[in-house]
Amino acid sequence: MARFPEAEERILNKKICMKCSARNAVRATRCRKCGYTNLRVKNKDVRRG
């Protein structure tokens, strides 16, 4: 997807809040915006629509 592995790591290595869809750090345990604790890892696969 990205041209460089460093860029891909920076873009895809995130957690997403299930409530407000905010991007958070990988080591986060709660959302930085709303405080929700249900975070998922950002999907790595490319979806074509």
Curated annotation (Swiss-Prot):
Highest taxon, organism lineage: Archaea
> Which GO CC annotations does the UniProt entry carry?
ribonucleoprotein complex; ribosome
Give the molecular function GO annotations. Answer: structural constituent of ribosome
The Gene Ontology biological process terms listed for this entry are:
translation
Keyword annotations for this protein?
Ribonucleoprotein, Ribosomal protein
Concerning Pfam families, the annotation shows: Ribosomal_L40e (PF01020)
**Does the entry feature the keyword Transport, yes or no?**
no
Q: Does the entry feature the keyword Ribosomal protein, yes or no?
A: yes
InterPro entries in the record: Ribosomal_eL40_arc (IPR023657), Ribosomal_eL40_dom (IPR001975), Ribosomal_eL40_sf (IPR038587), Ribosomal_zn-bd (IPR011332)
Q: What S-S linkages are listed for this chain?
A: none
Family per similarity comment: Belongs to the eukaryotic ribosomal protein eL40 family.
Query: Which HAMAP family does the entry link to?
Result: Ribosomal_eL40
Its protein name is Large ribosomal subunit protein eL40
Q: Which organism is it from?
A: Methanococcoides burtonii (strain DSM 6242 / NBRC 107633 / OCM 468 / ACE-M)
